[in-house]
């Protein structure tokens, strides 16, 4: 009897931590797989092209296979390049849960939650966000939208720019619906329009496409209103000319600046910490709000 109990305790102590990677893209993200292992998963099992219509059996497999006290060793990570599709899938996964039968789940499509949270948390550690005017340049992508929402939740007055006004308005509406925050939309199709968009801004974050320069040094370095800038682009040419990719809250022309790798170390540490948290119990639901809260503690 005692031997059986002891054997069961040993089995539980060495029970494998399984992370099921639910990706909306055809091929699950290699980046997310690597960080899943680095975050403490023993095995990462990726599934691609997932939708609310084809996940039922997969979710059932996670919630019905282990005893209640062992369910914490199974978790789900929702990813993919499409944030909107990821949000829908994330919510669909949870609809299959019921009392006693659930596992922890995290949403980080395109790295949007962890990247935005790390960026805004580093800005928050560098200065005051409440009451400041913030502009997210080319902010209609996953990272830009989430960063805008997080800044708004911190009390900043936020504007998202895009080459097309309708695209910026669409992003603002999505964030208002999801987070109940008000964000302004503004068209800014070229250097001059983007320089005009940040004229009165205190905070600027560039979240444009890889290798696209959004501002040149002369567009921001002499702007007396600007206090902090962050560039999420790590591939030359960088999003904001004059900011180094490795910059970590340094003073540049009287402004505090952060480069993509400068706050990227926090992004990776945060991502790993969230994965580890998934295996603490089976009831964690990690999305923008609690991921951002953790980022601020880690910053």
Give the predicted meaning of each segment.
Residues 2-100, 290-299:
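N-terminal ligand-binding/catalytic initiation module
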Residues 29, 49-53, 84-88, 114, ...:
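Conserved active-site and cofactor/substrate-binding residues in soluble primary-metabolism enzymes
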Residues 98-106, 252-254:
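Glycine/charged-rich beta-loop-alpha catalytic/anionic-binding loops adjacent to active sites
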Residues 106-124:
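A glycine-rich, Thr/Ser-enriched phosphate-binding loop motif common to dinucleotide/cofactor-binding enzymes
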Residues 109, 137-138, 223:
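Alpha-helical transmembrane segments of multi-pass membrane proteins, especially transporters
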Residues 125-199, 203:
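Glycine-rich phosphate/diphosphate-binding loop of Rossmann-like nucleotide-binding domains
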Residues 183-257:
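Rossmann-like adenosine-cofactor binding region
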Residues 235-299:
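Adenosine-phosphate binding glycine-rich loop
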